[in-house]
UniProtKB/Swiss-Prot annotation:
Upper lineage: Eukaryota, Metazoa, Ecdysozoa, Arthropoda, Myriapoda
Top-rank taxon, per record: Eukaryota
Signal sequence annotation: 1-20
Keyword Membrane in annotation: no
Record PTM text: Contains 3 disulfide bonds.
Name recorded for this polypeptide: U-scoloptoxin(12)-Sa1a
Length: 88
């Protein structure tokens, strides 16, 4: 009887450990939900960006609006003298 109880405890411990490992793995693989799915993707880098003559690549903060109540960065080509975005 004593060995049966020990066996049951060991099996229960192993099963619990396997369940916990699967849960950690599932959490690791879970893709976080995008809190702002309707917002367009922004470019956060000037790498490999070719800007026209007299323009520079830079990152400017976006304005805070009711639709986007947080500060974001928008990287792209800007006029060198006034940092206004280049219209494509």
């Amino acid at each position: 009887m004593k060995y049966m109880i020990i066996t049951v405890v060991i099996l229960f411990t192993c099963a619990l450990k396997m369940f916990c490992e699967e849960t950690e793995e599932e959490n690791h693989l879970a893709i976080p939900e995008d809190p702002y799915p309707s917002l367009p993707l922004r470019n956060y880098s000037c790498n490999n960006m070719a800007c026209p003559l007299k323009h520079i690549c830079g990152c400017m903060p976006t304005p805070i609006t009711p639709e986007t109540p947080f500060r974001d960065l928008d990287c792209g080509c800007y006029h060198e003298f006034d940092m206004m975005p280049v219209c494509v």
